[in-house]
Amino acid sequence: MALKADRYEESTDISFFYNEGTATRGGAVVLDAALASGAAMDQGGNKVKYGTAGVPAGILLNDVVNKDLTRTHLNQYKDEVQKGGKVTVLTRGWVLTDMIETSIDPAAGDIAYISASEAGDLTNVAPGSSGSLAVGRFMSQKDADGYAKVYVNLPGIVA
């Protein structure tokens, strides 16, 4: 479980698809800019993925699974989405997540960036001089279980 239920969702975006395999909610997704096309809600090319050093889209709020839907169904109570389906992305608000680089220990007030080494993770290490990878701000340090409160505010700084 990478995302706790204690969260505040001020703004979400439901215009993106996730097709990069399976994913656990709570990580930072980036735009799959190579495939983006159009601005309509059902543009199949508008995709997000767990990536490193990409343009942040927000925090993934669904579990992406790859199930045989002829034998079983998606668990609606877990917010499961089939691979290739639409996902909900948090663009403004705060969450408690453990999708944080294992090698860092963020402090309250540190800026949260997309990790340059671990796909889907957040870090407090700035990727060079650009602020375009900033997702928001850490509002706490990691607790005993590895979770930290992260305030998300996107779109962020434009470089």
List PLM regions with ranges.
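Surface-exposed, low-hydrophobicity beta-strand/loop segments enriched in small/polar/acidic residues
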Residues: 1-159
